[in-house]
């Protein structure tokens, strides 16, 4: 990811209208790659094919739920995840965050708020990637390239 706008975003929701609305707004905001999936199986396939930099996940999906999907994908990657769900109970939010989600936004939502949260998560991931890329490890020796 050269900039946050080069990031690949995976959007998972079973509502085709919401997929279109959010995808259009992400692209209008400058994000170049938005992959969509309407169920867990398609999401796993898209994740494997595109290796996204951010996931936006619904919870209620036709072939499972976003909680289980996140649990599965977390075994492969620590990509930032944001739940976008109509489930607004405190227990759901806490459970999702406890699984490792980085954020949780309930529907209905303000599009500008979603875009700001996406921007924040991608900026944080980008900064982390930059820090990692500036550390070189060879065997037992680690060199911080920022100090070199």
Roles of regions detected by a PLM:
Residues 39, 65-68:
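Acidic catalytic/metal-coordinating carboxylates
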Residues 58, 85:
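Active-site residues of response regulator receiver
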Residues 45, 67-78:
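Short amphipathic alpha-helix used as the core "switch/output" element in two-component signaling
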Residues 62, 89, 107:
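The feature encodes the CheY-like receiver
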Residues 20-28:
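Charged docking surfaces used in two-component/phosphorelay signaling
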């Amino acid at each position: 990811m050269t900039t946050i706008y080069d990031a690949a975003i995976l959007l998972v929701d079973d509502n085709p209208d919401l997929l279109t609305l959010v995808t259009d707004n992400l692209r209008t905001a400058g994000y170049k790659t938005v992959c969509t999936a309407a169920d867990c199986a398609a999401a796993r396939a898209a994740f494997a094919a595109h290796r996204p930099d951010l996931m936006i996940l619904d919870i209620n999906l036709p072939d499972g739920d976003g909680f289980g999907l996140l649990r599965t994908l977390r075994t492969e990657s620590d990509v930032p995840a944001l739940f976008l769900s109509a489930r607004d109970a405190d227990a759901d939010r806490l459970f999702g965050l406890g699984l490792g989600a980085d954020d949780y936004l309930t529907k209905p939502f303000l599009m500008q708020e979603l875009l700001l949260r996406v921007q924040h998560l991608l900026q944080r991931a980008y900064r982390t990637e930059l820090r990692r890329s500036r550390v070189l490890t060879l065997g037992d020796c680690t060199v911080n390239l920022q100090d070199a």
